[in-house]
């Protein structure tokens, strides 16, 4: 059977899906009107061997060292604002990969133009508003920047690697997510225009902190957002709709909505009442930390929004939340003041690994931990009780997955966010 996709993202129009499965990056044109056979328009495989010390010692000595296996998997995937480049990271050599996207190339739309090593393994990636630099957080709490250079005349990876790159900011705790924010939509009613188009880095860590730092002068901290009790794993700004808003979630039973520049918490959405029945014993604490009254724990895997723009219909602003290792997407309707109303649960038979939104046709694409039919599509439709997401037929992109496994236990570890939760023996 096929190994499922671990990461899905789409371009703004939702015409293309970019997907990661283990050490492969694939691109699909789901707008094609023809058959499924011609929808794959790009593919790249990472064949670089790990430079982990364990691997190098084994190669030199011939002795096998019994430690946790180091895989050459791809992680994290983000498009630049102009969608001309896509950025990924590797486990094998702790590098940032920068690809040029050229849909005019009928053979392969992906061209690797830079492979930049990072001192420690990346934990999250974002892009500055000009699309000139990738901002990279690592598992040791540091943040680096990597230039996104492009020279269309180059036929190979010839861009000079940046040597001895230095962190631009740091946390004392492991960084769990990072995003960029700008103020150009925040101060329309402010007579002082000095803040217009200013950039900020927003970082989250395992210690419940959300920090807002100036960029590029990131040693200047604007403020902190305090409102979480557990780790923060997701920072989401609806850039296309309202970049003044930040939505955050992690190990708490709730997600928060902020006016990030003002440091104002404007809404808290409680999730347990909607997700409790979909939690399993896998969500209990490890045995050594478990008591008779231990609740099943919530870990937020992904947050996204979708705003409909139908001229003939009332506009909807929808918030979609994925709790890790559950077979459900929670959908909320947000009003103009960002007060949330529960809309529906999109339920499938297997745990959802990731999802992406094709905004123009109001479709959600999900990747499932399934032995068959690991991709499902849902679109927003008018029903008797209002608009709801319903399953539809979509392009069969899973047929192109190049990784075969014997059984589900051979899948790569698909759920890791729960490991961010801090434990105590006391």
Curated annotation (Swiss-Prot):
Secretion signal, residue range per the UniProt entry: none
Repeat positions for WD: 69-111, 170-225, 227-270
PROSITE patterns, alphabetized: WD_REPEATS_REGION
Metabolic or biological pathway, per its Swiss-Prot or TrEMBL entry: tRNA modification; N(7)-methylguanine-tRNA biosynthesis
Membrane spanning stretches: none
Subcellular location field: Nucleus
BP terms from Gene Ontology: tRNA (guanine-N7)-methylation; tRNA modification
Entry-linked InterPro entries: Trm82, WD40/YVTN_repeat-like_dom_sf, WD40_repeat_dom_sf, WD40_rpt
GO cellular component: cytosol; nucleus; tRNA methyltransferase complex
Biological function: Required for the formation of N(7)-methylguanine at position 46 (m7G46) in tRNA. In the complex, it is required to stabilize and induce conformational changes of the catalytic subunit.
Summary of subunit composition and partner proteins: Forms a heterodimer with the catalytic subunit TRM8.
Family named by the database record: Belongs to the WD repeat TRM82 family.
UniProt-recorded name of the protein: tRNA (guanine-N(7)-)-methyltransferase non-catalytic subunit TRM82
